[in-house]
Regions:
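Non-globular targeting/processing and membrane-anchoring segments
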Residues: 6, 21-63, 177-218
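Thiol-based oxidoreductase modules, predominantly thioredoxin-like and allied folds used
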Residues: 110-146
Length: 218
């Protein structure tokens, strides 16, 4: 099985998938040192969201401030010019995903920081497209089922399919953390900085957050 925790680049996966619906949940421990993982300190309350609009994701892309690329493109760029990768795993029917796309990612300061410090990937967890990078291939688990999760989403999220999920990878394509649920710009800024600057390697999240000075304007 492809292991995002410990392996930079390993083989193709075949997964038995347990599908879960779009929700906000208390974030679970996942990878690396618990003291240096943001998700271990977040305790988000269950919240209901209305769909913000009938905008399609094509419209979101057109209006987006973030330079979204495919995972294969991010992988190739990372090999030439190493930097972290941020993956936004979403679905087209997910209200909180649309809210994060239209508000958080389109905040000018957030978008500029992402573009300057990360390779940003937006991935539809129910896509029917084949994902290829290096010599590895990920496909939909069921082409005939529009709601079937993709192997890539199931792999990178350890089958914990809740949306949106923001995955942070280092420049070796090793997974650092998974942040689940909607976050506004001010909540997201310190997390971006923590993984974007590499402070997670030397500073515990609680210490970093305590000293962090917000600059984002809502």
């Amino acid at each position: 099985m492809f292991n995002w925790k410990d392996i930079s680049m390993a083989g193709v996966i075949i997964l038995a998938i347990i599908f879960s619906t779009c929700k906000k949940s208390t974030l679970q421990a996942s990878i690396n040192s618990p003291e240096n993982k943001v998700s271990n300190y977040l305790n988000q309350d269950e919240t209901s969201y209305e769909l913000i609009s009938q905008m399609t994701y094509t419209e979101f892309y057109e209006k987006s401030q973030v330079n979204w690329i495919t995972f294969d493109e991010a992988y190739k760029k990372c090999k030439k010019n190493p930097r972290p990768i941020m993956v936004d795993v979403y679905t087209t029917w997910c209200g909180p995903c649309k809210l994060m796309s239209s508000q958080t990612f389109n905040n000018m300061q957030i978008a500029e920081y992402i573009n300057d410090h990360y390779y940003a990937v937006k991935f539809d967890a129910e896509s029917k497209d084949t994902v290829r990078f290096d010599k590895y291939v990920f496909v939909s688990t069921d082409i005939s089922n529009p709601k079937a999760p993709h192997q890539f989403a199931a792999s990178i999220l350890d089958n914990q399919l809740a949306y949106p999920s923001i995955v942070f990878l280092n420049d070796q394509i090793q997974r650092l953390d998974v942040i689940k649920g909607f976050m506004n710009a001010q909540s997201f800024e310190p997390i971006l900085s923590y993984y974007g600057t590499g402070d997670y390697q030397k500073t515990k999240w609680e210490e970093f957050k305590k000293d962090f000075k917000l600059s984002v304007k809502q």
